[in-house]
C-alpha cells in the first residue's frame, strides 16, 4: 500500500492534538495506521428515495472496520424532486447537485480521507457524488439506495408519474377525484427511488457502467436484503481498492463514458443523463460533448421496454438480468468497449464472462439487439436557430416526431400549467416555457407537471413542448429541453413571439422558428435582459457562476 493520505493527520509528534480528537471518536493506537474511509451518507426522511439509506451506511461502516479500514461517517443533503416539482422549491434541485459535490469534497479533503464510500438515492445524489469523486480522485465507490417497488392499483403498476398524469386526466374529465386519490395513495408503496427508468435509476446505471459501483447493484430494490449485502460487499471492495490504489480517474476514461451513453440509449434513460454526464466528464477532464450523444444514438438501439414510455419498471429489469445483461448484449454487438475496468480491477469483458449472450426467454423487458423497441437511441440532440448550442429531445414512444405549429409562450412553468389545466392548449400547438434555464430560473427546473398534464389530457402526441429548462426522467412525449443558449442570456428562444411558427423535427434533429436571420437580429436589438430577482443566497450565487446547459450546467469551469 502507498503512503496513506491520512498520515497527514495521524502520524508524528506534531499530530498529537489531531490524534486526540480522533481518539474521542473511537480510534485506538492500532487504528492510526489504517486507511480512513469517508462514508458520505445521504440519509434523509425528506423523501422515500433516501429514507432507507441509513441501514446501508451502517452496514458499510461495519464492513469497512472488518476489512481493515476506519470509517468516518458524515451527512450530505438531498432535495426531493418529486415533492418540490412544480413549485419554487424545484429551483434548488439542480443546485443541490453542486452542494452535494462540494460537501463531499470538503469533508473528505479537510479530513485527509484515504477513500470515500458515497450513498445516495434521489436524482442529484448520484451526479453530485460522482463530481466530487472525480474532483478528489481518491479510491471511491458508490452505493445506490435502490429503486422503489411499483405501486399497485387494480392490478396496474403505478409510479409517481401516475399521480402527475392523474392531475391532467382529472381536468380533462377522464377520471374522477376518487380515482385521483386512489392513485395518490397507492403509487409510492415504500422506500426507494422512483421506479421507472427515470433519472435516479438512469444515473445509478451510469455509475455501474463507469465501474464505480458493483455489477447488478444499480437495479436492486431498496427494501430487499440483497441491497444490504451489496452495501457490505461494496465497502469491502473499497478497502481493497485503497490498498491497490485504484482511483476513479483510472476508470473514468473516454471509452467508459461512451459505454455509459450507449447503455443510457439501450435502456431508454432520462434526458437528465445528458446534463449530468457532461458535468461529470468535465470534472474528470474527459472530452465528452453533446454531439457524442447524437453520434452514439445513431448506432445504439433501445432494447429495454421501461417506463415512462414503456411498460415495465426497474425491478423488472433487475429480474431480467439488470445492467450486466444489457451490457453483454451491447458488447456482443460491438457497441461498448470491453477493455474498460471497474473498481475491482476487472475489465468489462471479464466480469460479463458468465452473463448469457441472449436475454432470458421468459421475460419481455430486455430484447435482443436484432429485435429492438427502436432502431436508434431515444435521446436526440436537436440544433437550429432556436438552439445553436443544442437541445435534448426524448423521442421514445413518440409516434409523430415532427410538428410545426404556433408558439404558445409562457415565462414560467406555473403560468404554463395553469393554461394547460384551463384547457387552453390545443392540438398542433408548440408550448414554449422560457426563462427556466440554469441562469434564468435559476436552477433549470424540471417540467414534469406541464408535460404530465398534457399527456393526461390526451395531447401527448399532438403537442410539442420546448424549454430552456429540464424535464423529469418521468417525462415522455414530444418534448425538447436544455435549449441553449437560454433565454436569460439572450438566446433566440427569448426572441420568439406568440404565434410564431416553430418546427420540431426529431428525424432531422432540427428545432427552428420560421424567422429570417434579419428579423431575429432586429428583435435581439430590442431584447432587454431580465432582472435577476434573487439578490442574496444560493440561487443568486448559482445564477452568477453556472455554465450553459450544453456544458453540463457546471459551476467550476
UniProtKB/Swiss-Prot annotation:
Keyword Metal-binding appears in the UniProt entry: yes
The answer to whether the entry has keyword Amino-acid biosynthesis is: yes
Q: Which SUPFAM superfamilies match?
A: IlvD/EDD N-terminal domain-like, LeuD/IlvD-like
- Positions binding Mg(2+) in this chain are 81, 123-124, 446
Q: Which reaction does it catalyse?
A: (2R)-2,3-dihydroxy-3-methylbutanoate = 3-methyl-2-oxobutanoate + H2O; (2R,3R)-2,3-dihydroxy-3-methylpentanoate = (S)-3-methyl-2-oxopentanoate + H2O
Pathway in which the depicted protein is active: Amino-acid biosynthesis; L-isoleucine biosynthesis; L-isoleucine from 2-oxobutanoate: step 3/4; Amino-acid biosynthesis; L-valine biosynthesis; L-valine from pyruvate: step 3/4
Transmembrane ranges? Answer: none
Q: What does this protein do?
A: Functions in the biosynthesis of branched-chain amino acids. Catalyzes the dehydration of (2R,3R)-2,3-dihydroxy-3-methylpentanoate (2,3-dihydroxy-3-methylvalerate) into 2-oxo-3-methylpentanoate (2-oxo-3-methylvalerate) and of (2R)-2,3-dihydroxy-3-methylbutanoate (2,3-dihydroxyisovalerate) into 2-oxo-3-methylbutanoate (2-oxoisovalerate), the penultimate precursor to L-isoleucine and L-valine, respectively.
- Please describe the quaternary structure of this protein: Homodimer.
Q: Which family does it belong to?
A: Belongs to the IlvD/Edd family.
Record-given protein name: Dihydroxy-acid dehydratase
Annotated organism of origin: Prochlorococcus marinus (strain MIT 9312)
